[in-house]
């Protein structure tokens, strides 16, 4: 779904290895995660229009799915969110589609 424009903020750091934060954007989008096999992790990709490869992302799954965790989030290509899911259970997990919150930080 469309998001608002990047909100401009500037943060002061200690100067040496700082990367200025130029803004952030919050997306809410329905993601339909494919089944994740037992005792494994798997990366899946989703289209999120507006993401750039230089963005850093934080993703919030809206509900608890026993045995399933989101263990990594990255922008793998322009407009593409890559999420790694870990299944710690003894059986496959196929979660229902949900509205995830994706916060992108632009540097």
Label for each model-derived stretch:
Residues 2-51, 81, 91-107:
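Extracellular receptor-binding modules and their adjoining Ser/Thr/Gly/Asp/Asn-rich linkers
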Residues 64-67, 91:
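Extended, low-complexity, turn-rich repeat/linker tracts enriched in Gly/Pro/Ser/Thr and Asp/Glu
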Residues 70-75:
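Glycan-recognition/cleft segments
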Residues 77-79:
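Residue-level recognition of beta-strand termini and adjacent short loop/turns
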Residues 85-89:
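Asparagine-centered strand-capping/turn motif at beta-strand->loop junctions
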């Amino acid at each position: 779904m469309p998001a608002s424009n990047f909100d401009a903020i500037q943060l002061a750091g200690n100067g040496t290895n700082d990367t200025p934060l130029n803004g952030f954007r919050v997306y809410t989008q329905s993601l339909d995660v494919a089944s994740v096999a037992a005792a494994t992790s798997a990366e899946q990709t989703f289209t999120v229009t507006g993401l750039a490869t230089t963005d850093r992302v934080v993703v919030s799954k809206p509900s608890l799915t026993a045995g399933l965790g989101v263990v990594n989030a990255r922008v793998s290509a322009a407009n593409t969110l890559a999420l790694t899911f870990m299944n710690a259970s003894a059986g496959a997990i196929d979660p229902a589609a949900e509205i995830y919150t994706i916060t992108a930080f632009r540097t």
